[in-house]
C-alpha cells in the first residue's frame, strides 16, 4: 500500500498486536516550483471542453440503472422465498445506493458549471438531481464553492476543518480505542452528511448558528439568500412527494425502496469526501502560510477499483478537480496524467484499500498541530498523540 510511492510500511514482526510502524513522506509544504498556468498548459485543451450531450448521457445512464434496480425490486422480490429476500434486499440497497451516489456526483458536477456551457441548465439539472436526494442544491453549491476557494485553510475552509490539539473535546481521548473508533465511524458515515447540512458539524467555525437550510445563515451573503429559499422549496417538494408515496405505498415500502439506499448515499458521500481531504501526509495552513495553490494540492487521489468509474472518477481525480473545478469528470483521468510529471512529490495518490484507509485515518488523524521545533509554525500536520 502506498501514497504515490511515498508511503512505506515497515514489516510487521508482532502478529499478536498487529501494530504497524509507518514512515510516511509528506507532501511538500513549501511554495511549489510551478504555477497554475504551467499546469494548465500541460493539459490538452479538449479536457476543458464541456459537452452537453456527453454529460447528459451520464445522467440518462445512471437514472436508467436506478430505474432498472427499482423495477426488479418491486416486480420480483415479493415472489422470492423468504430466505432469498434477506439476500436480495441488501444487494438492492448496495446497488441502488452506489448508483444514487453517482447521481449525487453529477449534481455536484452541475454546481461547478462542469456539466455544460450553460449555467442556467447546469443549475436546473443540479437542482433536480440533488433535491431528489434531499440535498439543498444552491445551499451546498455556495458553501462548496467557498471550500474550493479556501481548501486546507484552518480559518476559512468550509468543511472537514481539523481541530487543533488544544481545541479537541475532553471526551476524544476516551473514544481513541477500537470500540470508540467504530462507534464514531458508524455515526459519521450514516448521519454525518445530514448533520453537516443541518448543524454545520465538521464545518468552519462561525460566531453564530450555521445551517444550510437557513437563508440567513452566516454561510450566505444577502445576494445569495433567494437561492437558499429556492433550495428549501425544492426540498419541501421532494419531502411532500415522499410523504404522498409513504401514504400510498406504506412507510416500510418507502424505507426499503428509497430510505436505505439514501443512507448508503450518505455513507458513501462522507467516505469519499473525507478520504479526499484526510491523510497524515497532507498539510493544513493557518493564515500566515496559506495560499490557494498549496491548499489545492493538499488533497489526495484514492483508488476505489471498479467504483472509480461508477462514481465518475470523483474518487481518483480529486487533485485535478481542486485545481480546475469546472473541468468535466470524463476528462479528469487524462488531465491528471498530464500534470503528474510536473506535480512530482506535490501529487499524493494512495491505493490503500478503502476500508483500511477509513480505519487508519480515523485512528491517526485526530487533530492537527505544527511540528515541534519547526520554524514553519503556520503549517499543521495530523497527529493522534495526546
Curated annotation (Swiss-Prot):
Reactions performed catalytically: a (9Z,12Z)-octadecadienoyl-containing glycerolipid + 2 Fe(II)-[cytochrome b5] + O2 + 2 H(+) = a (9Z,11E,13E)-octadecatrienoyl-containing glycerolipid + 2 Fe(III)-[cytochrome b5] + 2 H2O; (9Z,12Z,15Z)-octadecatrienoyl-containing glycerolipid + 2 Fe(II)-[cytochrome b5] + O2 + 2 H(+) = a (9Z,11E,13E,15Z)-octadecatetraenoyl-containing glycerolipid + 2 Fe(III)-[cytochrome b5] + 2 H2O; a (9Z)-octadecenoyl-containing glycerolipid + 2 Fe(II)-[cytochrome b5] + O2 + 2 H(+) = a (9Z,12E)-octadecadienoyl-containing glycerolipid + 2 Fe(III)-[cytochrome b5] + 2 H2O; a (9Z)-hexadecenoyl-containing glycerolipid + 2 Fe(II)-[cytochrome b5] + O2 + 2 H(+) = a (9Z,12E)-hexadecadienoyl-containing glycerolipid + 2 Fe(III)-[cytochrome b5] + 2 H2O
> Where, by residue number, is the motif Histidine box-3?
318-322
User: Which positions, given as ranges, span the membrane?
Assistant: 65-85, 87-107, 182-202, 228-248, 250-270
Q: Name one GO molecular function term.
A: oxidoreductase activity, acting on paired donors, with oxidation of a pair of donors resulting in the reduction of molecular oxygen to two molecules of water
Alphabetical keyword list: Endoplasmic reticulum, Fatty acid biosynthesis, Fatty acid metabolism, Lipid biosynthesis, Lipid metabolism, Membrane, Oxidoreductase, Transmembrane, Transmembrane helix
Please list the tissues where expression of this protein has been recorded: Expressed exclusively in developing seeds.
Q: In which pathway does it act?
A: Lipid metabolism; polyunsaturated fatty acid biosynthesis
Q: How does it sit in the membrane?
A: Multi-pass membrane protein
**Location(s) in or outside the cell:** Endoplasmic reticulum membrane
Chain spans, region Disordered: 1-28
Q: Which CDD domains match?
A: Delta12-FADS-like (cd03507)
The UniProt annotation puts motif Histidine box-1 at 108-112
GO BP terms, alphabetized: unsaturated fatty acid biosynthetic process
Query: What's the family?
Result: Belongs to the fatty acid desaturase type 1 family.
The domain-related comment in the record is: The histidine box domains may contain the active site and/or be involved in metal ion binding.
Q: What is this protein called?
A: Bifunctional desaturase/conjugase FADX
Amino acid at each position: 500500500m502506498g501514497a504515490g510511492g511515498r508511503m512505506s510500511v515497515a514489516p510487521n514482526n508482532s502478529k499478536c498486536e498487529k501494530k504497524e510502524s509507518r514512515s510516511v513522506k509528506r507532501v511538500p509544504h513549501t511554495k511549489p516550483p510551478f504555477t497554475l498556468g504551467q499546469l494548465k498548459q500541460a493539459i490538452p485543451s479538449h479536457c476543458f471542453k464541456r459537452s452537453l450531450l456527453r454529460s447528459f448521457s451520464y445522467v440518462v445512464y445512471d437514472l436508467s440503472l436506478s430505474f432498472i434496480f427499482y423495477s426488479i425490486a418491486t416486480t420480483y422480490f415479493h415472489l422470492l422465498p423468504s430466505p432469498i429476500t434477506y439476500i436480495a434486499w441488501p444487494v438492492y440497497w448496495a446497488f441502488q445506493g452506489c448508483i444514487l451516489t453517482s447521481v449525487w456526483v453529477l449534481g455536484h458536477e452541475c454546481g461547478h458549471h462542469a456539466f455544460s456551457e450553460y449555467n442556467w441548465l447546469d443549475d436546473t439539472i443540479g437542482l433536480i438531481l440533488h433535491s431528489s436526494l434531499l440535498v439543498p442544491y444552491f445551499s451546498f453549491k455556495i458553501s462548496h464553492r467557498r471550500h474550493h476557494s479556501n481548501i486546507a485553510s484552518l480559518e476559512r475552509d468550509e468543511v472537514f476543518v481539523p481541530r487543533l490539539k488544544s481545541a479537541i473535546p475532553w471526551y476524544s481521548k476516551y473514544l481513541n480505542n477500537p470500540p470508540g473508533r467504530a462507534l464514531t465511524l458508524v455515526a459519521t458515515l450514516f448521519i454525518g452528511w445530514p448533520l453537516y447540512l443541518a448543524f454545520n458539524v465538521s464545518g468552519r467555525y462561525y460566531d453564530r448558528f450555521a445551517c444550510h437550510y437557513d437563508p440567513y445563515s452566516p454561510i450566505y451573503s444577502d445576494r445569495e439568500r433567494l437561492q437558499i429559499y429556492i433550495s428549501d422549496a425544492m426540498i419541501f417538494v421532494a419531502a411532500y412527494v415522499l410523504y404522498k408515496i409513504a401514504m400510498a405505498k406504506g412507510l416500510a415500502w418507502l424505507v426499503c425502496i428509497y430510505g436505505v439506499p439514501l443512507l448508503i448515499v450518505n455513507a458513501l458521500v462522507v467516505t469519499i469526501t473525507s478520504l479526499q481531504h484526510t491523510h497524515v501526509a497532507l498539510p493544513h495552513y493557518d493564515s500566515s502560510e496559506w495560499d490557494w495553490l498549496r491548499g489545492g494540492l493538499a488533497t489526495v487521489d484514492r483508488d476505489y477499483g471498479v467504483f472509480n468509474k461508477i462514481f465518475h472518477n470523483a474518487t481518483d481525480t480529486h487533485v485535478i478537480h481542486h485545481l480546475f473545478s469546472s473541468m468535466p469528470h470524463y476528462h479528469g483521468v487524462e488531465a491528471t496524467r498530464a500534470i503528474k510529471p510536473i506535480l512530482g512529490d506535490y501529487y499524493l495518490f494512495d491505493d490503500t484499500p478503502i476500508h483500511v484507509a477509513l480505519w487508519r485515518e480515523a485512528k491517526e488523524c485526530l487533530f492537527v498541530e505544527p511540528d515541534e521545533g519547526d520554524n514553519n509554525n503556520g503549517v499543521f500536520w495530523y497527529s493522534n498523540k495526546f
